Regions:
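Extended polybasic, low-complexity segments that bind anionic RNA or targeting/receptor surfaces
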Residues: 1-45, 92-211
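Glycine/serine-rich anion-binding loops at beta->alpha junctions
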Residues: 53-91
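A short, flexible low-complexity segment enriched in Lys/Arg and Gly/Pro that occurs
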Residues: 29-67
Length: 211
């Protein structure tokens, strides 16, 4: 599939071919949700953990007889009712995490997300930025002229610093490296802008059957 490249410097538009093996994929909502859940669970490590009554150190002996005292029935002092007892329904730490996910599943999800963005006409490929620039005014004008507000920019290492400097004060714009390309950020923002070098890297990675 052919894409017309956007040009930050305002020169002539070039084209790039991206494999139909990526761009013709159908969007699987269940698969995408599974991968996003995995990603979010690993972004915020849940370290908080409380002891339940079976984990509290102490005797399991009843504190007094079942009958004859005139008081409410109780078991041991490890019950959540007592000070020093276990915590009822408290956080369990890493138990909530999805431990592993297949690499191929992540690749398929990324490819499907790119195809979805293309179908919705929200995928834009940008010519590599050869000159250094760090003015927000120039970059903001480019975004407005191309109606690219609320956008995620996936950049190669050579261009990343320029984008970070020029886009850090623009609302609803985020810059990430192609190595950190992920479906959560891609779906969070309306438009997806990928530099030419980054697109080639991502395409090669997705089509590589060995990894």
């Amino acid at each position: 599939m052919k894409f017309n490249l956007l040009n930050l410097e305002g020169g002539k538009s070039e084209t790039i071919d991206v494999s139909d093996k990526i761009m013709k994929l159908k969007f699987n909502h269940k698969l995408i949700k599974y991968v996003i859940d995995w990603q979010l669970n690993h972004q915020k490590p849940r370290t908080a953990k409380t002891k339940q009554r079976n984990e509290v150190r102490g005797s399991t002996k009843k504190i007094y007889a079942q009958k004859g005292t005139g008081q409410a029935r109780h078991a041991s002092k490890k019950a959540p009712l007592f000070v020093g007892g276990g915590q009822a329904h408290g956080p369990k730490g890493a138990v909530y995490k999805i431990k592993k996910i297949n690499k191929k599943v992540k690749k398929i999800a990324l490819a499907q997300t790119l195809a979805k963005k293309n179908t919705d006409k929200q995928l834009h490929i940008l010519s590599d930025v050869k000159k250094e620039f760090n003015k927000t005014k120039i970059f903001n004008k480019f975004l407005l002229n191309n109606n690219l507000t609320n956008a995620l920019i996936v950049s190669d290492k050579n261009s990343e610093k320029n984008f970070v400097r020029s886009a850090r004060n623009i609302k609803n714009i985020k810059v990430i490296s192609d190595e950190g390309a992920n479906i959560y950020d891609m779906l969070k923002y309306t438009n997806l802008i990928i530099t030419l070098t980054s697109m080639k890297k991502i395409e090669t990675r997705l089509l590589d059957e060995k990894n």
